[in-house]
From Swiss-Prot:
Known function: Has chemotactic activity for neutrophils. Contributes to neutrophil activation during inflammation.
Disulfide links within the chain: C33-C59, C35-C75
Pfam families per record: IL8
Keywords from the UniProt entry: Cytokine, Disulfide bond, Growth factor, Inflammatory response, Secreted, Signal
Lineage: Eukaryota, Metazoa, Chordata, Craniata, Vertebrata
Name of the protein described by the UniProt record: Growth-regulated alpha protein
Signal peptide coordinates: 1-24
Subcellular location: Secreted
Recorded family membership: Belongs to the intercrine alpha (chemokine CxC) family.
Length: 96
C-alpha cells in the first residue's frame, strides 16, 4: 500500500510542478516594485489620496503613489522636496 501511494505521488509530482498555480505566477507579479518610473511632483490640488509604502520584501525602495481626482494613479519620487511637502500636508490633514 505504501509503495502504491509513493508511486502515485511520484507520478503526480511533475504535473503539479508544471501547473500555473504550483509555480506561484500570480504571487510573482505582486512581489515587485509598483513604481517603475516616478515624477518629481504633482499639484497638491489634483491629489485625492496618497499611499506611502515603505521598503519591504516586495521592493527595496519607498514608494509614494498618488491617486488623482480623475482616478489615475501616479508614482511620485519620495526624494523630491515637493513630494515630501505633499506628504507632510496630507499627514497634517489627517484628523487625530
Amino acid at each position: 500500500m505504501v509503495s502504491a501511494t509513493r508511486s502515485l505521488l511520484c507520478a503526480a509530482l511533475p504535473v503539479l510542478a508544471t501547473s500555473r498555480q504550483a509555480t506561484g505566477a500570480p504571487v510573482a507579479n505582486e512581489l515587485r516594485c509598483q513604481c517603475l518610473q516616478t515624477v518629481a511632483g504633482i499639484h497638491f490640488k489634483n491629489i485625492q489620496s496618497l499611499k506611502v509604502m515603505p521598503p519591504g520584501p516586495h521592493c527595496t525602495q519607498t514608494e509614494v503613489i498618488a491617486t488623482l481626482k480623475n482616478g489615475r494613479e501616479a508614482c511620485l519620487d519620495p526624494e523630491a522636496p515637493m513630494v515630501q511637502k505633499i506628504v507632510q500636508k496630507m499627514l497634517k490633514g489627517v484628523p487625530k
